[in-house]
Amino acid sequence: MISNILKKSNSLFLRSTLSSNKFTNVTILRNSLFLNNNNNDNNTNIKQTYNKINFFSTTVPNQNEKIELKQEQIKQEQQQQPEQQPEQQTNKINNEIELKIKILENSLKYVNSYGWTSEAVSKACIEMGYPPITQGILGEDSAYELALYFVTKCNTDLMIKLSDAENSEQQLLSGLSKKEKVKLALKLRLSMIKPFIGRWSEAMQLLANPKNIVNSSPSMLTLVDNIWYLVGDKSSDFDWYAKRGLLIALYTSAELFMLSDTSVDHSNTWRFVDDRVDDLIKTIKFKNDIEETVGITLNTFLQKIKK
């Protein structure tokens, strides 16, 4: 009788031990069942079984406690790890930027052989002692990044040349009219692409690609804005936008003309720039004359009405 009861209890408590969310302790029940049956062999076997259940139930944690223990372990590991100082983070970023610039600058040597392509960047990485996969640091399209780097570098170099008071170009610039200053600035900027003129159409395609145009536009806007600034233009409102839009169109057309120019030292391109700048200044002057004429006429008309 007691044996049957204990067998059923054994099964029930085993299931309880495995499914419970807390530790299960069956010691109390075990003691109460065996108080008056110490001489029974069957009871002894059952007692051993309960001892096993008691050991199992008091040594195996449930799933929730495992998760809590793991979270506590992760928290302790995070506390032990030293936090990166802002200075260390800044140095890491600066080192990464320097590496990008070195790779891109070195890649320019391979443009004439491999074009504005990822292959040119790979060759540069290999020469520097890095595997070709290192170009991934530049982004998804290393060829585009190379073209964008070059035009940005050229814009910066132009600004430095025309802003340096000790530079010979600055001395020439100071003695020129606004029209001649614009011509000189455009010619200096166009001359910077001469070393890559045979491959420049590839760069233009990359920069004008619809997926890249958003990132490419600021470089062109910076170029024309710098030129008008160096010329001394102080226009505002609509004039500011009109002049920059016209100069962008002029420079782009000059680049396209230069691609097919076979004249000595691109003399035809420089003549093209001279003619287009003359037209640009005439257009701006004509626009200003029209505005002035309309203003005078309107003012005269209003004065007559008041009388």
Swiss-Prot record:
Signal peptide boundaries: none
Residues annotated as binding a 1,2-diacylglycero-3-phosphoethanolamine: 241-244
Gene3D superfamilies with a match to the protein in the record: Tetracycline Repressor, domain 2
Region of interest (Disordered), residue spans: 72-92
InterPro entries: COQ9_C, Ubiq_biosynth_COQ9
Positions with biased composition (Low complexity): 76-92
Record's subcellular location: Mitochondrion
Coiled coil: none
Molecular function per GO: lipid binding
Keywords, comma-separated and alphabetical: Lipid-binding, Mitochondrion, Transit peptide, Ubiquinone biosynthesis
Pathway of action: Cofactor biosynthesis; ubiquinone biosynthesis
Keyword Transit peptide: yes
GO biological process, one term: ubiquinone biosynthetic process
One term under GO cellular component: mitochondrion
Protein task: Membrane-associated protein that warps the membrane surface to access and bind aromatic isoprenes with high specificity, including ubiquinone (CoQ) isoprene intermediates and presents them directly to coq7, therefore facilitating the coq7-mediated hydroxylase step. Participates in the biosynthesis of coenzyme Q, also named ubiquinone, an essential lipid-soluble electron transporter for aerobic cellular respiration.
Family: Belongs to the COQ9 family.
Name of the protein in question: Probable ubiquinone biosynthesis protein coq9, mitochondrial
Biological source species: Dictyostelium discoideum
